[in-house]
Design a protein with these regions (language model features):
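Conserved nucleotide-sensing/catalytic segment adjacent to the nucleotide-binding pocket
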Residues: 50, 56-114
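The conserved Walker
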Residues: 32
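Small-molecule kinase domains that catalyze NTP-dependent phosphoryl transfer to phosphate-bearing small molecules
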Residues: 149-199
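N-terminal pre-Walker A segment at the start of P-loop NTPase domains
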Residues: 1-17
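Conserved phosphate-donor/acceptor-positioning beta-strand/loop module used by diverse small-molecule
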Residues: 112, 124-146
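Walker A/P-loop
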Residues: 37
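Hydrophobic anchor at the beta1->P-loop junction of P-loop NTPases
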Residues: 28
Length: 199
């Protein structure tokens, strides 16, 4: 495993897939820009599945209009029960609630987002884990080009600095924020190692 843990800049590697339990759950993890949402959204119009994009649980501004009809219900349930949607290691509480919600509704579950790999140990996940292993430079560029034009943030920068400086400021800020992808990449490789070592 360590031999393969080097950074792949452009080359994609096959997704890492591991079944942890017989639950009808697919957990899709990977760095920003790795294709998690694209993979999960293939099931969004399939009535057998609930597709939860974790970023949308936190009201992160997006220009995307695609959202599972159950997502607002899940969010409402979490806020009603806990007062908020937990982040970090505490997300495991929300994770269990989301699983129970899917089971009560007799649906298979696809859950995707970076907050999933805050659950420790990663082997606590249920069902199948799919780790997207897209080349790191490709992830970085995808994330920058996807997130740069998000109208909410772009509008704030333009209002603050004017049309030209505002756009440059937005680009600078998004590049700075998306540098975290390189740290995430190594963390995900460690998660794969942990999954590999799990009997």
């Amino acid at each position: 495993m360590k031999k393969n843990a080097k950074i792949y800049l452009l080359k994609d590697r096959p997704d890492y897939i591991k079944k942890l339990s017989d639950d009808d759950i697919i957990n899709v993890i990977g760095t920003k820009g790795s294709g998690k949402t694209t993979s999960a959204n293939k099931y969004i119009y399939n009535d057998d599945y609930i597709v939860i994009n974790c970023d949308r649980l936190y009201d992160m501004p997006t220009d995307s209009k695609i959202e599972d009809e159950f997502l607002p219900k899940v969010k409402e349930l979490l806020i009603k029960k806990y007062g908020k949607v937990y982040t970090g290691k505490d997300f495991s509480i929300c994770y269990d609630e989301i699983i129970n919600f899917a089971k009560k509704n007799k649906k298979k579950l696809i859950i995707e987002g970076n907050v999933i790999y805050d659950i420790e140990p990663i082997t606590k996940l249920k069902g199948t884990v799919i780790v997207k292993r897209t080349g790191i430079l490709k992830c970085f560029l995808r994330a920058v080009f996807r997130d740069y034009p998000t109208s909410y943030f772009l509008k704030l920068e333009i209002e603050k600095h004017g049309p030209i400086i505002g756009r440059l400021s937005r680009l600078k800020n998004i590049i700075k924020r998306r540098k975290s992808i390189f740290k995430e990449y190594h963390r995900i490789e460690k998660d794969i190692e942990e999954l590999e070592n799990d009997a």
